[in-house]
A protein has these predicted regions:
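Sec-dependent bacterial lipoprotein signal peptides
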Residues: 1-19
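Cyclophilin-like peptidyl-prolyl cis-trans isomerases
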Residues: 2, 21-242
């Protein structure tokens, strides 16, 4: 297993990787979203394996459209239990997208208190990390607070594909950190935020509707990175892939 100390270099590279990745910054975005051409990723990595019959998927019905993500309960059991429990309780229904960083992340799930909730009476749970899941574009992740713990806040990685987000410098640092070739190759095609690996929980991967996530990612935001016009999560549903 890759030692977490090797991540220092990638974390230091984060600021460089994010420079210039936005479509507009504060107040950015426009009335018509720019279509992002995302290539198909041919990879043996779990996140790029199409869902199989019986896999658990989450369906996000938003005011901007619908997107779907396959979940990986075997890799993040506490996050899965909490997320599914909150979905079944209707917690996310009616919440709005709380943060958008174009070309980086789309985030929601804070709730009225701005902190989020859990099925354990608000008690936090630790981030769950694994060598099997990574912050590729389209990854569904659970946000962490300052203590490194999670609640209901989730985000989708909305980084641009290929070298638009994964620069040669990041590739070199992944190689130096001991990444396997398959992971580096997947990052080079899909794009992503490798500097977030091993810092928080990857719970799933968007397999349909990434164009909706991209459209949300290009919305105009205020100085707090909140969309100027509300983008509402009408509902989140858990179902089995058929």
């Amino acid at each position: 297993m890759m030692h977490k100390k090797r991540w220092a270099a990638l974390v230091l590279a984060a600021a460089l990787a994010l420079t210039g990745c936005s479509f507009g910054g504060v107040g950015g975005g426009g009335n018509t979203a720019q279509k992002i051409d995302r290539p198909a990723v041919e990879s043996a990595e779990l996140q790029f394996t199409h869902p199989a019959a019986g896999d658990t998927v989450a369906v996000f019905d938003t005011s901007a459209g619908v997107f779907r993500a396959v979940l990986f309960p075997d890799k993040a059991l506490q996050a899965y239990d909490n997320f599914v429990g909150l979905v079944q309780a209707g917690y996310y229904n009616g919440l709005t997208v709380s943060r958008v960083e174009s070309g980086f992340v789309v985030e929601a799930g804070q709730g009225a208190d701005g902190r989020g909730s859990t099925i354990w009476n608000g008690g936090r749970y630790p981030a769950e990390t694994t060598d099997s899941l990574h912050h590729y574009s389209g990854a569904l992740c659970m946000g962490t607070d300052a203590s490194g713990e999670c609640a209901s806040v989730f985000y989708v990685v909305q980084t641009l594909p290929g070298e638009q987000s994964v620069t040669q410098e990041l590739v070199d640092q992944m190689n130096s950190a001991g990444y396997c070739a398959e992971v580096v190759s997947a990052y080079q095609t899909a794009g992503g935020a490798p500097y977030l690996d091993y810092t928080d929980t990857v719970l799933g991967q968007v397999y349909e509707g990434m164009d909706v996530v991209d459209a949300i990612g290009q919305t105009a935001v205020d100085e707090n990175q909140k969309p100027r016009e509300d983008i509402t999560i009408n509902s989140v549903s858990i179902m089995q892939y058929e």
